[in-house]
């Protein structure tokens, strides 16, 4: 349904957040340096789906759920309905299948138009013919703000070391 968005995501760092050899090497180094005391510090941003599924922090990617291996997918942002601020990736993704509501910066006007038009042959009910589609898109203003991304894109280690400052750099540019 969103081929351009999918194509952009599929070659982005978000798509490789959990599978990246650089990430996995860095995480292994941090684990070794801290004797494993960093817990879920890295994976809660690199694998929020796995965290919400209750997967262990230290687990082979081969043993993870296929969706968990996809890194930061659409649902990581579009299934959040609360503003978290800077919580270092501790996000509670609203669970559900394709038919459950999604959240976005614009709300549901376009979705309603697509559903009502009949042109797209979409289906909002399980077991019915047609392309399955979300039943509702609710407005989530925070998704349209740059601060939303700061939840994961400012990384301060427990000793105060600023590992990544992407959001702060953007904010101060």
Locate predicted features.
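Sequence context of c-type cytochrome heme-c attachment sites
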Residues: 3-70, 81-144, 150-173
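Elongated alpha-helical scaffolds
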Residues: 73-76
């Amino acid at each position: 349904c969103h081929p351009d968005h999918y194509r952009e995501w599929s070659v982005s760092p978000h798509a490789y957040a959990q599978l990246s050899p650089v990430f996995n090497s860095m995480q292994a180094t941090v684990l070794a340096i801290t004797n494993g005391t960093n817990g879920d510090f890295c994976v809660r941003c690199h694998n929020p789906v796995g965290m919400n599924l209750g997967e262990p922090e230290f687990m082979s990617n081969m043993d993870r759920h296929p969706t968990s291996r996809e890194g930061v997918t659409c649902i990581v942002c579009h299934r959040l309905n609360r503003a978290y601020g800077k919580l270092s990736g501790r996000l509670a993704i609203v669970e559900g299948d394709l038919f459950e509501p999604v959240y976005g910066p614009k709300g549901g006007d376009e979705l309603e138009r697509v559903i009502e038009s009949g042109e797209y042959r979409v289906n909002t009910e399980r077991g019915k013919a047609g392309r399955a589609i979300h039943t509702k898109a609710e407005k989530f203003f925070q998704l349209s703000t740059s601060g939303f991304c700061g939840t994961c894109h400012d990384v301060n280690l427990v000793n105060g070391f600023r590992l990544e400052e992407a959001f702060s750099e953007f904010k101060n540019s």
